[in-house]
Amino acid sequence: MSSYFVNPLYSKYKAAAAAAAAAGEAINPTYYDCHFAPEVGGRHAAAAAALQLYGNSAAGFPHAPPQAHAHPHPSPPPSGTGCGGREGRGQEYFHPGGGSPAAAYQAAPPPPPHPPPPPPPPPCGGIACHGEPAKFYGYDNLQRQPIFTTQQEAELVQYPDCKSSSGNIGEDPDHLNQSSSPSQMFPWMRPQAAPGRRRGRQTYSRFQTLELEKEFLFNPYLTRKRRIEVSHALALTERQVKIWFQNRRMKWKKENNKDKFPVSRQEVKDGETKKEAQELEEDRAEGLTN
């Protein structure tokens, strides 16, 4: 029952509640266990008295039923619990249309228990998954289409080692095309030297310079085998040894003003012996003439 209907007629409901109490229809005393229960109990008693007071007048109308419709109300706490609240959560009480107010509040039937959840299905849905990878969960596995065929895989670019592919910046990159795969080499793939940049000058230590000078005095021209030995002994590259000998031979020619450079030390000795022999012959010829 709405509070808008109860509050204006509270004085009449109070008188009707007193009349109902005198008639022997007492309200459940457990309503007054808590400090806020008298207000709730008084409202329920007033509502029950109003139904009895105005029920007969409402019965004269054909469209109105003789009894009020049922609507749920919160349950008062039992006498054993006091102000502690209800016995269980979710338990509600309903008020039927007829009967005394004390007997009208009955416990609603408990809701049916929820059925237990079904057991989880087996991982493979009853199908033996071990030994049958082709049909997992009852479905055929998808056939993967190869992205490349065997011929295309053979034609894929096989990148060489970075050290061998990079090479020196100043060297001709044509040999890179020969060593790499037969695929097309674009111009932007070739290593290019920076424009206007010169290679740094190589510096040699005193030990390296001394050993190179000794080798130059012994033989100004090195063979390929001897050049490899010298480069390994001095921790240099063959190119560095070759360039050093070229520069040293040019320096010797400028210092001696000679077009022909001695091939080896043996030729130098032979030249000296020839000069000495010529001088001796000249001295003998002078002695005979005198």
UniProtKB/Swiss-Prot annotation:
GO cellular component: chromatin; nucleus
Membrane-crossing residue ranges in chain numbering: none
DNA-binding region: 197-256
Subcellular location: Nucleus
SUPFAM superfamilies: Homeodomain-like
UniProt keyword list: Developmental protein, DNA-binding, Homeobox, Nucleus, Transcription, Transcription regulation
Biased amino acid composition, Basic and acidic residues: 255-278
Composition skew (Pro residues), residue ranges: 108-124
Alphabetical list of Pfam families matching this protein: Homeodomain
PROSITE patterns (UniProt xref): ANTENNAPEDIA, HOMEOBOX_1, HOMEOBOX_2
InterPro entries: Antp_homeobox_TF (IPR050948), HD (IPR001356), HD_metazoa (IPR020479), Homeobox_Antennapedia_CS (IPR001827), Homeobox_CS (IPR017970), Homeodomain-like_sf (IPR009057)
Chain spans, region Disordered: 60-127, 161-200, 255-290
GO molecular function: DNA-binding transcription activator activity, RNA polymerase II-specific; DNA-binding transcription factor activity, RNA polymerase II-specific; RNA polymerase II transcription regulatory region sequence-specific DNA binding; sequence-specific double-stranded DNA binding
CDD domains in the record: homeodomain
Main location: nucleus
UniProt record similarity statement: Belongs to the Antp homeobox family.
UniProt protein name: Homeobox protein Hox-D8
Species annotation: Homo sapiens (Human)
Lineage, uppermost ranks: Eukaryota, Metazoa, Chordata, Craniata, Vertebrata
